[in-house]
Amino acid sequence: EVHKTDFNAIETDDPSLLFRFFDGFFLYAFILSWAKDDLLDWFQPKTRDTSKRDFNWLDTMWRRTLISSNSERMIGKLFSISVNIPAFLERFPDAKLLYMIREPLNVIPSGLSLVTGVLDGVFGFWNLPVEKRQFYIDRLYNALIELQLRFHDDWINDRIDKNKVMIVKYDKMMLNFEG
C-alpha cells in the first residue's frame, strides 16, 4: 500500500473546507467526481472563486489553533492552494511555502492511491464494477493533473513570488530526509 489512511485520519487542513462549507477540492475528489457531468470547472478560480471565504476560514481556524496551543507559528499542510497560490500569498503576506514536486508518473498514482484508499475503507471502492471505478479514476486523474498545471502556469508566468516559495524535490528529500 502506498498510503495507509482512512476517513477519520488527520491529513491536511483541506478537509476542514469540505466540512465547513461542503465545498472545495475534497468535495470534487470524493463526491462530485462521480457526477454524470464533469464538474471540475466549478473549482477553477476563474469560474468560481471561493478563495476569500476559504482563506478567511483557514485564518480563523489557524488563529484558534495558535491560541489553544499557546504557539506563535502555524504550519499548515495544504495541497489545494496550489490552484491559487498568488491569492493565498496576497491574503497571507507573511506566509512562506514549501512546495513539494515529484515526478508526475509517481505523484499521480500516489494521489490516486490516497483518495481511493479512503473510499475503499469507507465504501469498498475496489469492490465496485470496473466501469464505475475507471470512470472515477479518470476524473480524479484529470483533477490531479489540473492541480499541477495550475501551479506550473502561475510559476512560469511569474504570478507567484518566488521569494516566498521554496521548491522541494521529493526524491532529493527522501535521499537525505534528516539533512
PLM feature spans:
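PAPS-dependent sulfation machinery
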Residues: E1-M74
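PAPS-dependent sulfotransferase catalytic domain
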Residues: R48-S71, L78-R91, A95-E178
